Design a protein with these regions (language model features):
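Eukaryote-biased recognition of intrinsically disordered, low-complexity regulatory segments
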Residues: 2-15
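Short, structural beta-strand-to-alpha-helix junction motif
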Residues: 24-28, 52, 72, 279, ...
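S4-like RNA-binding module at protein N-termini
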Residues: 55-84
Length: 496
């Protein structure tokens, strides 16, 4: 038996749903099997955006665009979901729908619902941020405001990849929307039910019922004590690919998404404590003031749909050699706090936590509690090179952290992703930099040393030689920026 003992309940287009299904059933599967076929399946991996829906995960935030193809329906208990069928209010089209009609932005039509939902989510965020008295009014017109609106429009649909018959009308629709006031969706649609959200389905049956969503650390540890080998899920942006791409099954899943201690986030002027279930989106918003290098970089991680779901702990736990956060956390000498159901918390340096290709120190019964980082006031540069600007996997990534006394380096941390079986640092290179002044001769020597030290593979994303050259060039670029030298602007590095 893999069904939960009592159905979960969630709001779908204003109607309360009660559903009992597999632990790993996706929202997209649920929608299409129940006849709501406006939400399309394109890639089944969270890349194309055709399956975009809006989800209100708590009553303190707007509806957020998410990929239904990799979203477990069991995680929606108490939440509110809107699909393209439910977007109109009182039979009046939502402005995003109307704008695409007016500009002839439907392309072939298959991916249009995803574009509509992404734009509607962006509009809702603007209206929600304005508050009840703001009326969702757009920013006053000016050339600078127009530039910002256009950039925001492009960002809103960066997770919708279809370009089949003409992209410009879609951009025109988006820019039209940027100048229109709108009302927050919670004013016209069903909003999250707080009491239902805080409730739990009845789990009086044995644990084999499949899906659990503990709400405290103690409850999480109790579940792990019963089933230490159960699969843990937070955002599921990587784990659910085992289901959608490899036809795997997860009969037992424990969700970390509702444990407040794992969603905790503190960033001060020089340090950060990041709960493992903190989403990329929440981290990006919090990092803007004290960790601008990370704030800038995170706009290159996935898409809005992915950033609304993916988590810091998930990026760490999968230990992918191209995991976007791993070089950054290596360069920051991050400490990983691991918990266990029957042992005290354990602090582990990230350099020891990563054990090889998709291997970590995590053992059955373990989970990542939080990540601790210091050095936010140091000189920081994070780079990612990929074939697409948005929503793409890195071919190579570089993270550089320097402590400087004038132009002399007193501490250096240099980390790379996409160049080996795991993200790595070059300690010998770092040691050689300490006490050195940044000179042209030093940068030339470092460039050569990186070429010698790295031995990446060639694959569909990049050749071995390209990866080596790019890694070396980006390190030199960081050192030149540390000197304050003017650098040419590079699309994807400087305009995120």
């Amino acid at each position: 038996m893999t069904d939960i003992s009592n159905p979960i309940q969630f709001w779908l287009n204003g109607a309360l749903q009660a559903h009992s299904g597999r632990a790993d059933e996706t929202l997209l599967g649920y929608l299409r099997h129940s006849g709501r076929v406006g939400t399309k399946e394109g890639c089944a991996s969270g890349d194309c955006g055709a399956c975009t829906v809006l989800v209100q995960t708590d009553d303190e935030h707007a509806y957020k665009p998410m990929n239904a193809c990799i979203l477990p329906v069991q995680q929606l208990h108490g939440q509110a979901v809107i699909t393209v069928e439910g977007l109109p209010s009182n039979d009046v089209l939502h402005p995003a729908q109307a704008a695409l009609i007016e500009t002839h932005g439907a392309q072939c039509g298959f991916c249009t619902p995803g574009f509509v939902m992404a734009l509607a989510g962006w509009m809702d965020e603007q209206a929600f941020s304005a508050g009840p008295d703001g009326g969702g009014q757009p920013e006053a017109d000016s050339p600078q405001a127009e530039t910002r609106r256009l950039k925001a429009c492009r960002e809103a649909i960066s997770g919708n990849l279809c370009r089949c018959t003409g992209y410009r009308p879609i951009l025109q629709a988006a820019t039209h929307l940027a100048s229109r006031p709108t009302r927050a969706l919670f004013e016209t649609h069903q909003r999250l039910d707080k009491a239902l959200f805080n409730s739990q389905p009845d789990h009086s049956a044995p644990y084999k019922t499949g899906f659990r969503a503990p709400q405290t650390l103690n409850d999480l540890k109790d579940l792990l004590r019963q089933q230490p080998s159960a699969n843990l899920i937070a955002g599921g942006t990587d784990l659910m690919l085992e289901v959608t791409q490899k036809q795997g099954r997860f009969d037992q899943l424990i969700s970390l998404a509702r444990v407040p201690a794992l969603r905790s986030l503190q960033i001060s002027s020089d340090s950060a404590i990041i709960g493992s279930a903190v989403t990329y989106q929440d981290l990006q918003a919090a990092a803007e003031l004290h960790w601008p290098a990370l704030h800038h970089f995170l706009s290159r991680l996935g898409s809005p749909q992915i950033r609304n779901r993916g988590t810091v702990g998930g990026n760490l736990g999968t230990a992918s050699p191209i995991g976007d956060l791993l070089p950054i956390l290596l360069a920051m000498d991050a400490t990983i706090v691991m918990s266990h159901f029957e042992a005290a918390d354990q602090n582990v340096a990230i350099s020891e936590f990563l054990q090889g290709y998709r291997k970590t120190q995590l053992q059955p019964g373990n989970f990542i509690k939080e990540v601790q980082v210091t050095g936010l006031q140091d000189f920081l540069r994070y780079y990612k090179i990929s074939k697409r600007q948005e929503d793409d996997i890195a071919a190579v990534s570089v993270a550089v952290r320097l402590k400087l006394d004038a132009d002399q380096i007193t501490l250096a941390r240099i980390a790379f992703g996409g160049v080996a079986e795991q993200a790595l640092r070059l300690p010998a290179l770092e040691q050689a930099l300490q006490g050195q002044a940044i000179t042209e001769a030093l940068m030339t020597a470092l460039h050569q040393q990186v070429l010698i030290a790295l031995n990446p593979i060639s694959d569909v994303r990049a050749s071995r030689d390209y990866r080596r050259e790019m890694a070396a060039n980006l390190l030199v670029r960081a050192l030149k920026e540390a000197l304050g030298l003017p650098m040419p602007q590079i699309y994807g590095l400087d305009d995120a």
